[in-house]
From Swiss-Prot:
Keywords: Carbohydrate metabolism, Cytoplasm, Isomerase, Metal-binding, Zinc. Pathway: Carbohydrate biosynthesis; D-glycero-D-manno-heptose 7-phosphate biosynthesis; D-glycero-alpha-D-manno-heptose 7-phosphate and D-glycero-beta-D-manno-heptose 7-phosphate from sedoheptulose 7-phosphate: step 1/1. It is found in: Cytoplasm. Its main location: cytoplasm. InterPro entries: GmhA/DiaA, Phosphoheptose_Isoase, SIS_dom, SIS_dom_sf, SIS_GmhA/DiaA_subfam. GO terms for biological process: carbohydrate metabolic process; D-glycero-D-manno-heptose 7-phosphate biosynthetic process. This is Phosphoheptose isomerase.
Length: 197
């Protein structure tokens, strides 16, 4: 039992080391896109399933409230939180459309979709991406493994942040770190702090 616990920490550390080599450029590009989106008066919509739904809500909460610095709230919506909407769409249409229908209603050109899936193959997230593209939104995709079908939907103006792992738990751990990196970059770009203060 103790060895298994230690192995989980070791795997997590190694995955983060690998991600630190592979992901900074795509994280920086995604943060720049998000800053431009927010400066343009647009918003960021986020979606995912299970733990990825929690990540979508975490990201939205950090923007709407604050990350590490005092600042005005920033517009972000987690598409995972309204149980009446989610169950109505799932019941009347299908679970595959629970995010896409919200995007068709709320998404505007210039908005960003933060699409989160450890496998890259979640069908409702893929439909969300298709809806976002139809609304002239750009996409930041957080994936893992081989990127799945989500990777094939991305265009030149989109960005994929693919965690170099095949283990769902390790991918989720890095997704949270990526979200914190995005929030930190957004805050420090929009609201520069005096590092010596």
């Amino acid at each position: 039992m103790l060895e298994r616990i230690k192995d989980s920490f070791t795997e997590s550390i190694q995955t983060k080391i690998d991600a630190a080599e592979a992901l900074p450029d795509s994280i920086a590009k995604a943060a720049e896109m998000m800053v431009a989106c927010l400066l343009g008066g647009n918003k960021i919509l986020a979606c995912g399933n299970g733990g990825s739904a929690g990540d979508a809500q975490h990201f939205s909460a950090e923007l709407l409230n604050r990350y590490e610095v005092e600042r005005p709230p920033l517009p972000a919506i987690a598409l995972t939180t309204d149980s009446s909407t989610l169950t109505a769409i799932a019941n009347d249409y299908s679970y595959d459309e629970v995010f896409s229908k919200q995007i068709l209603a709320l998404g505007q050109p210039g908005d960003i979709l933060l699409a989160i899936s450890t496998s890259g193959n979640s069908s409702n997230v893929i439909k969300a991406m298709e809806a976002a593209l139809s609304r002239d939104m750009t996409i930041v995709a957080l994936t893992g493994k081989d990127g799945g079908a989500m990777a094939g939907l991305l265009g030149a103006s989109d960005v994929e942040i693919r965690v170099p792992s095949n283990v769902t738990a390790r991918i989720q751990e890095v997704h949270l770190l990526v979200i914190h990196c995005l929030c930190d970059n957004i805050d420090r770009t929009l609201f520069p702090q005096d590092e010596n203060a």
